[in-house]
Amino acid sequence: QNQPLLDALNACIAACEHCATACLQAGDVKMMARCISLDHDCADICALTARLVARGSEHAQHLLRECAEVCKACADECAQHQDQHCQECAEACRRCEQACRAGLQG
């Protein structure tokens, strides 16, 4: 029953890792510093959340709330950049935010 949530979390991890790597390889790393930082934070909290959800932890609900907030912050930042990897990351983060919020109600 948690598979759609786990899929969204894993897709977000992949998108954030790809975005951070692409930003680091771009010319102006300083301009992308907040994006890179949020990508790392988002990938990390998504990974931890996925592990807790997968094992049915009683603490998963707490992390789902925080994960949704970090996904929103990351999506908002990435959406400001025109790079394709940033736009794709913003979409994945928004989908993950929605999945986490849905998981809170389930």
Predicted regions and their residues:
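Amphipathic alpha-helical hairpins
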Residues: 1-106
